């Protein structure tokens, strides 16, 4: 589910910092953060002139295969964010910066950042 790059998956599965059990407090904190960020009043606190670039893998189960990202993108637009962009990378999974097409992702992010520098 992480990436199609089997070298990255093998590295991840063998790394001591990536193969730990999530604690009850970890889950509690995760759900508190998810609850906080999904509240409409918190969307409305985001500065409307803050540019945002949402990128995700279209095959990421964590993002509901792109549907979750589309939903959040629309919520941001509906809250009045003026400059928001979204790109879903077909066939990419959760870690798009570690995918087989990572150079394309890097290039797209660099182009977006360059276009938004003042």
Q: What kind of region is each of these model predictions?
A:
Residues 1-45, 49-55:
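Alpha/beta-hydrolase
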Residues 16, 56-58, 90-93:
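Short, histidine-centered active-site or binding-site loop motifs used for metal coordination
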Residues 19, 61-62, 95-96:
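Short strand->helix junction
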Residues 24, 65-69, 98-103:
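Conserved strand-to-helix beginnings and helix N-cap segments that scaffold or border functional pockets
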Residues 29-32, 71, 104, 108:
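Alpha-helical elements of Rossmann-like donor-binding domains used by nucleotide-donor carbohydrate transfer enzymes
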Residues 37, 79-118:
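Catalytic active-site module of serine/aspartate enzymes centered on a nucleophile-bearing elbow/loop
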Residues 51-54, 58-85:
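Conserved loop-alpha-helix segment in the C-terminal half of the alpha/beta-hydrolase fold
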């Amino acid at each position: 589910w992480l990436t199609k790059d089997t070298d990255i998956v093998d590295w991840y599965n063998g790394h001591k910092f990536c193969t730990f059990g999530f604690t009850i407090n970890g889950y509690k904190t995760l759900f508190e953060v998810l609850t906080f960020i999904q509240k409409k009043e918190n969307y409305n606190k985001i500065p409307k002139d803050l540019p945002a670039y949402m990128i995700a893998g279209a095959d990421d189960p964590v993002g509901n295969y792109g549907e979750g990202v589309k939903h959040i993108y629309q919520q941001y637009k509906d809250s009045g964010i003026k400059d928001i962009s979204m790109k879903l990378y077909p066939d990419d999974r959760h870690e798009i910066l570690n995918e087989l097409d990572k150079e394309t992702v890097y290039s797209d992010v660099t182009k977006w950042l360059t276009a938004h520098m003042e």
